[in-house]
Every structure is written in structure tokens, then in C-alpha cells.
Amino acid sequence: MTTRMLSIAGTSLELIEHGRGRPLLFLHAGEGLMPERPWLDLLSQKYRVIAPWHPGWGNSPLIDGNGTVDDLAYLYLDLADQLGLENAALVGACFGGWVAAELMVRSTARFTQLVLVDPLGVKFGGRDERDIADMHALPRAEYLRRAWADPARGEIDFTKLPDSELAAIVRGREAFALYGWKPYMHNPRLKRWLHRINRPTLLLWGAEDRIVSPAYGEGWRQAIPGARLELIRAAGHFPHWEQPEAFVDRLTAFVEGNR
């Protein structure tokens, strides 16, 4: 595993690369990358995983003027150009799924498959319906109950973390709120453009996700032409962390079956 800093269109970006073979660009969740969890090692056995820390997370500073999800979509298109990616798979989880969808409605040129893992970013319900749980307002215990099939697996003992890690967690949460504060965690215009995604698309969903439910995933399936929705049992909002083997197996079967 290697970590380096890149300059993309004047923005500094911390980038993790792991594995060899066909490129796979992974856009992380609002909780961050968590490269120490098994998902990354498992995925790197199949692909050359390219995993940037979004601006505001890790050691990636915020974009000048703070930036928007639109900026992130264009930033990662520039990253793909700079790295010369060809026939790559694009994977986005949670907040990263929103960014991945925004990227793909703009250009699918460098990517041959799209995998969205419990993405945010779209409102399918009525004005007074909450499609996406208010993660920032929930008490920690309630958030864990909604986000994980087994809440104990998501628990972090903050008292044992060094100050540098605590500061990074706070920065990431501030950035997450910044990008999705209003309107809350979605782009009202994105739904109308999802038909532009003309690559095979898999929606992987934790069967016990109570941040965005599988019914919300069905809305995504209907909005993207030809998309498939598959549920991962015993997983909540982060199936790549909670059930990494099942996540990698499903992803690999889809990507290799749609080359």
C-alpha cells in the first residue's frame, strides 16, 4: 500500500493505492476510508485500488472556497485524466456514491462499470418525507443502531485515540456536513440526470441499512437504466466494512461479468 499527495487542478489530494491489475477508483463514505479494515486488502487482491481522501478528510485540505459536490465530481474526472485511467471501475460508498453518480452523469468516458454502495444524493420521496436519516442530529447510540447491523462493530473508543486521529475525525465530520448541509445530503437536480449513466450499474445495499433503506435503493434502481439492486445480509449502511468478503465477492462478480 502506498500513500502520496497529488495536485489536481490546484487542489492537494491524499491518495492511497493498493494492489495491481485493472484500475478501480474508490470514493469513500462520509465516515472516511478506514483503510485499516479488511475491505481494502481484499479488494486489492483483485484490482489496483485508487482511493483518494476527499478534500476535508485525511490530509486532503478543503478546496479553496470550501467547494461543493459538483467540484468533487470534476476533481475526480481530472484525477482520472491525470492518472490516465482506462476501462476503470468506479465504486462509491455513501457520500462517495453521491459523488460517483454526479461524476458519471457528466462523463462515463474513463469508466466501464459503476458500483454504488448505499449512496446518498437523491430525494425520491415527497417534500415532507425523510429519505435520508439526519446522521448529524442522531445521538451516537441511535446512529450506530441505524448504520450497522451489529452496532458494536461500528463503535470507536475515542478515549484511546491520539489527538491527531481525533482531529482528523472532527475535520472529516465538518467536511461531511459542509458538503451536504443544505439541501440535506442530496442534489435536487441529480435525479433528472441519472438516465445519462450509460454503463452497467450495480447498487449494493446493506439489507439492514436504516440510514437509507433498501426501498430508497429501489428508487435508484428505477432511475438508472438497466441498474441492478442486490442486498447484502447482516449489513447496514457500510457493507464494505461490515461484510467485506460478501462485498468484494458481489463487486467482483459484477465487474468481471460486465467487461
Please give the residue ranges for each predicted region.
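Acidic catalytic loop of the alpha/beta-hydrolase fold
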Residues: 208-212
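Conserved HGGG/HGGXW glycine-rich cap/lid loop of the alpha/beta-hydrolase fold
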Residues: 9-61
